[in-house]
């Protein structure tokens, strides 16, 4: 069954599911800046909109747009800014 998650007072919502190979979530972010933590390695693909990300170990922001993926290792924290309402697919390894 699906599990619905809500973060940052409802500004970020996701639905967890199992792909053929990995657990995943598909979600949406309202405009804003957020800090996330990982417990597993995450492959995050922007489905629509754009996300500006400061990855662990970097102080440089990178912008990812539709179809682009970034990777965050397990047990890390990272910052994301959504300049517009955006959606994503995140697979966990």
UniProtKB/Swiss-Prot annotation:
UniProt keyword list: Glycosyltransferase, Transferase
Pfam families per UniProt: Ppnp
GO molecular-function terms, A-Z: guanosine phosphorylase activity; purine-nucleoside phosphorylase activity; thymidine phosphorylase activity; uridine phosphorylase activity
Any one annotated GO CC term: cytosol
Catalyses which reaction(s): a purine D-ribonucleoside + phosphate = a purine nucleobase + alpha-D-ribose 1-phosphate; adenosine + phosphate = alpha-D-ribose 1-phosphate + adenine; cytidine + phosphate = cytosine + alpha-D-ribose 1-phosphate; guanosine + phosphate = alpha-D-ribose 1-phosphate + guanine
InterPro entries: Ppnp (IPR009664), RmlC-like_jellyroll (IPR014710), RmlC_Cupin_sf (IPR011051)
Stretches of the chain forming a coiled coil according to its record: none
Record EC number: 2.4.2.1, 2.4.2.2
Function, as annotated: Catalyzes the phosphorolysis of diverse nucleosides, yielding D-ribose 1-phosphate and the respective free bases. Can use uridine, adenosine, guanosine, cytidine, thymidine, inosine and xanthosine as substrates. Also catalyzes the reverse reactions.
Cross-referenced PANTHER family: PYRIMIDINE/PURINE NUCLEOSIDE PHOSPHORYLASE, PYRIMIDINE_PURINE NUCLEOSIDE PHOSPHORYLASE
Family, per entry: Belongs to the nucleoside phosphorylase PpnP family.
Protein name, as recorded: Pyrimidine/purine nucleoside phosphorylase
Upper classification of the organism: Bacteria, Pseudomonadati, Pseudomonadota, Gammaproteobacteria, Cellvibrionales
